[in-house]
Amino acid sequence: MRQVRPFEENSLSLSRIQMEKVSAVPLWQRWLSPHELVRDKERAGEIHILDTQLFAEEISTIYSSKQTKSDQRAALLSLSKVKLSEGRKALEVGLMRDRDGAVYVGAHAILIDQLIGGLVAAAENYVFATKARFALMAVGGYGRGELAPLSDIDLLFVMPQRHKKSDAEFVEFILYMLWDLGLVVGHASRTVHQNIAAAGEDLTICTSLLEMRSIAGA
């Protein structure tokens, strides 16, 4: 069997240039904050995940059409499925090319951030025509900015102290869209005071709150 020499390019190894690129930042540092690692790459123009401006324009086109609300929701769901599928495929191609797991999990988290952000904006601008009164936070591993291919998406809706029926309807709209996209979503809705109380009673909740990160909303 042919022996593969160090740095020889094949389907299972990295080229010398790729190795130097990957090792430029210490491995432990890359995994410490993959979300920020990918954000830096975005700002440098090295990686592109979701064209958020185009996504917003396509959503606007859906809601400017003379369709029923049901048809508009179906069109939004269909568009979101395309964005999710295309984004994940691009991440898979990048992973197979660069063999960089830290970039993958960070970029996957950002893809979901941007997708959820687009859905919240659609709800604010068209579905409910009012700003969200809750803060939508990523928690757990997703909050750390690490999202493996089949990981749960853990969300926390930080509700206003005096919330209304419309707030619950807004939350339900987002959750049902995510579920219909085929995503596995763990979620909780609590006020600030309820979060503090829950963190004092449950260590798991406490640690998840330590890793929370804002995605959208108030």
Where are these regions (language model features)?
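A nucleotide- and high-energy phosphate-metabolite-utilizing enzyme signature
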Residues: 2-218
